[in-house]
Curated annotation (Swiss-Prot):
This is Probable UPF0122 protein. InterPro entries: RNA_pol_sigma_r3/r4-like (IPR013324), UPF0122 (IPR007394), UPF0122_fam_protein (IPR054831), WH-like_DNA-bd_sf (IPR036388). It comes from the Bacteria. Might take part in the signal recognition particle (SRP) pathway. This is inferred from the conservation of its genetic proximity to ftsY/ffh. May be a regulatory protein. It comes from Mycoplasma mycoides. Belongs to the UPF0122 family. Transmembrane segments: none annotated.
Length: 113
């Protein structure tokens, strides 16, 4: 069961990273990745649709996944987005005051890696 959860978590994370970084990918990377992750097509279905080998699709999706994780490691856009969403929720539910919100917001904006 844990393996299934890890696979599901990884797929969800990749889907979120794809939404953030997809404009940095090639058209082919976007096509294959979206069909595989978001549309849940199999490697064979994608290969048939584009008249290429299953291995070529696998290689593209694998490289794209590594690239998305690499981009997040370098740019931290998803991590910042998650922090900002958390801050917004806290201010909306009065868990923090305006001063703390602004201080935390500055920390996210000027975050050093």
């Amino acid at each position: 069961m844990k393996l299934k959860n890890n696979l599901l978590e990884k797929t969800l994370e990749l889907s979120e990273l794809f939404k953030i970084y997809k404009e940095l990918l090639t058209d082919k990377q976007k096509q294959y990745f979206e069909l595989y992750i978001d549309e849940d097509l199999s490697l064979s279905e994608i290969a048939d649709e584009f008249n290429i080998s299953k291995t070529a699709v696998y290689d593209s999706i694998s490289k794209t996944s590594k690239l998305l994780f690499s981009l997040e490691t370098k740019l931290h856009l998803k991590q910042k987005q998650d922090l900002l969403i958390s801050l917004i929720n806290k201010i909306e539910t009065n868990q923090i005051d305006e001063k703390q919100f602004i201080k935390s917001l500055k920390e996210v904006i000027w975050w050093k890696y």
